[in-house]
């Protein structure tokens, strides 16, 4: 299952969640709302701090959501890689 870190208040995250539902692929994705619980936020921040995919995000002062973590642990910020 692909993990999607995001927040409903983020327009890009909301659009990704909407597309996942619209194309009936909910069983392929676990959407994790980082604003729902501090444990989710901590997990995302640890990922954001260590993954190379976030370097431009960190340098630009951005949050980096939505973020996708594949089953093999690789990270991308590009929803198009999943047809979204």
Which residue stretches match the model-derived regions?
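Thiol-based oxidoreductase modules, predominantly thioredoxin-like and allied folds used
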Residues: 27-50
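Surface-exposed, flexible loop/turn segments at secondary-structure boundaries
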Residues: 10, 37, 76
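Short, internal strand/loop/helix patches
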Residues: 50-61
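Non-catalytic, surface beta->alpha helical segment in thiol-disulfide oxidoreductase systems
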Residues: 63-84
């Amino acid at each position: 299952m692909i993990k999607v870190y995001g927040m409903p208040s983020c327009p890009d995250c909301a659009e990704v969640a909407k597309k996942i539902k619209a194309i009936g692929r909910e069983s392929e994705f676990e959407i994790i709302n980082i604003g729902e619980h501090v444990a989710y936020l901590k997990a995302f921040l640890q990922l954001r701090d260590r993954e190379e995919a976030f370097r431009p995000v960190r340098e630009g002062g951005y949050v980096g959501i939505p973020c996708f973590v594949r089953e093999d642990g690789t990270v991308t910020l590009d929803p198009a890689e999943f047809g979204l």
